[in-house]
Amino acid sequence: MLTALKTDTGKIRQHNEDDAGIFKGKDEFILAVVADGMGGHLAGDVASKMAVKAMGEKWNEAETIPTAPSECEKWLIEQILSVNSKIYDHAQAHEECQGMGTTIVCALFTGKTVSVAHIGDSRCYLLQDDDFVQVTEDHSLVNELVRTGEISREDAEHHPRKNVLTKALGTDQLVSIDTRSFDIEPGDKLLLCSDGLTNKVEGTELKDILQSDSAPQEKVNLLVDKANQNGGEDNITAVLLELALQVEEGEDQC
C-alpha cells in the first residue's frame, strides 16, 4: 500500500484546524484518519488534533485488529465513540473549548477490504478503474435538503448554509456513526479529505489527478495546490491510499 498525506492552512485562515494521520500496523494493516475541527478561538484545532491523536493511540495500543468487515466496523465505532466522549468531556471542563467539535473520517485497510467510518462532511472517495465514487454521505443540512428533494445538488453547491453540519464528533455525549465496508483490489485508490478540498476542486478534477501517473505524494500536493488556486478560503487536507499494482524494486510501499 502506497500512502501520502498533505494538510495546508489555505490562503485565508490564520490557523489550520484540520489534522490527519496514517498509522501502520502488523500485516501491513493501515488506519487513515482525517479530522476538520470547529469551534471558537483555537478550539477546533484542539478537537481535530485530539481526534487524530486518540485514534492513533488506540491503533497502537490494540493487541489485535479484526479482519472481518463487520468486526472492523465495530472496532471503528467503539474507538470513535470513546474519542467522542474524550473531546466532549474536555470541552465541558475547559470554558474556552465549549462548543468545539470536529468531523472525522477513518479508513481501516486490512489487506483485501477497507472499512470506513465517518461523522460530518469530511469525505472518502474510491477510484476503481474508471469509476470514481463518494463512499461517505455528508452529515450536513444541505445534504439533508438534497436527500429529501427540497433542493438540487446543483443548488447545494452554492447554498449559503452549505457548511452547517447535522452532527459532529465531540459536540454531544452520544453520536451515531456511519460505516461501510468494501473489497479493494490492486490499482484501487482511496482519498480521504476535508471540505476545504471538495468545496474547491470538482469531482472530475479529483478523478483526473488520482488517475495520473504521478507519485502519491505528488498527487496530494497537486490536490491541495488546486484548492488554493481556486481560492483556498478553508484549511485543506488530503490523504491518499493506493493499493499498488506491483512493487517496483527499491520502491517504498509506505
From Swiss-Prot:
Keywords per UniProt: Hydrolase, Manganese, Metal-binding, Protein phosphatase, Sporulation
PPM-type phosphatase domain boundaries: 2-243
Coiled-coil region list: none
Listed GO MF terms: metal ion binding; protein serine/threonine phosphatase activity
Cofactor(s) in the UniProt record: Mn(2+)
Entry's EC annotation: 3.1.3.16
Top-level taxon of origin: Bacteria
Major enzyme class: hydrolase
Function noted in UniProt: Protein phosphatase that dephosphorylates PrkC and EF-G (elongation factor G, fusA). prpC and prkC are cotranscribed, which suggests that they form a functional couple in vivo, PrpC's primary role being possibly to counter the action of PrkC. May be involved in sporulation and biofilm formation. Does not seem to be involved in stress response. Dephosphorylates phosphorylated CgsA, EF-Tu and YezB.
Protein name stated in the entry: Protein phosphatase PrpC
Species in which this protein is naturally found: Bacillus subtilis (strain 168)
